[in-house]
Amino acid sequence: MSVSMDHRVLALAGVAQALQQVRRIAETGHSEAATVRTAMDSVFRVDAASPEAVYGSAAALAPGLRLLHNYFRNQGQDEVLPRLALAVLQLERRFVRDTSTVATVASGIDAAARQAQQLGDSSHPDVLSSLGGLYAQTISHLRPKVMVQGNPHYLGQAGVVAEIRALLLAAVRSAVLWRQMGGNLWDFLFAKRAMIEAVDRALR
């Protein structure tokens, strides 16, 4: 299979991995620090030379790749996650066609990147707040709206909401990369076997 399919599944794993954290935070109020950092780093690495470089390494995407592995074999335990992923992949189309929103997001990411550099942590709460606010002011106004359900106790906390929105921004970033690598929703119908093989290669 072509390298492009290998690259596509890495980007798709980035989408799944970020959204898994969204689901986790919404339900429990807690996230996995290393996974969140991988997601935030991917937002800032806009000029990376390869999909692997966007996430630091293919190994950093192991949780997302396992999610894809289970999904393709009908072993996924979270029925909501695929629906969230589909909404994000559809939202990406609206986003990239809205040049004004793209420019605003790019400027906001640049500002947040400087903030992260000053703080020495891409997943610092202040950085998450900045990126979450950026998502709320821009992409969240596009359709389809990504609806996140969870425990009302946690969804009422500003820090939790900011982290969820920052991760949704990261998911959209991965969706953009997926499309840049040639990804298309038709892949799920007509290239499923190739996707499964690419996921298996990435997990070896």
Swiss-Prot record:
GO terms for cellular component: cytoplasm; plasma membrane. Keywords: Cell inner membrane, Cell membrane, Cytoplasm, Membrane. The gene is hflD. It comes from Xanthomonas euvesicatoria pv. vesicatoria (strain 85-10). The keyword tRNA-binding does not apply. Its main location: cytoplasm. HAMAP family: HflD_protein. InterPro entries: HflD, HflD-like_sf. This is High frequency lysogenization protein HflD homolog. Pfam families: DUF489 (PF04356). It is a peripheral membrane protein. Belongs to the HflD family. The lineage of its organism: Bacteria, Pseudomonadati, Pseudomonadota, Gammaproteobacteria, Lysobacterales.
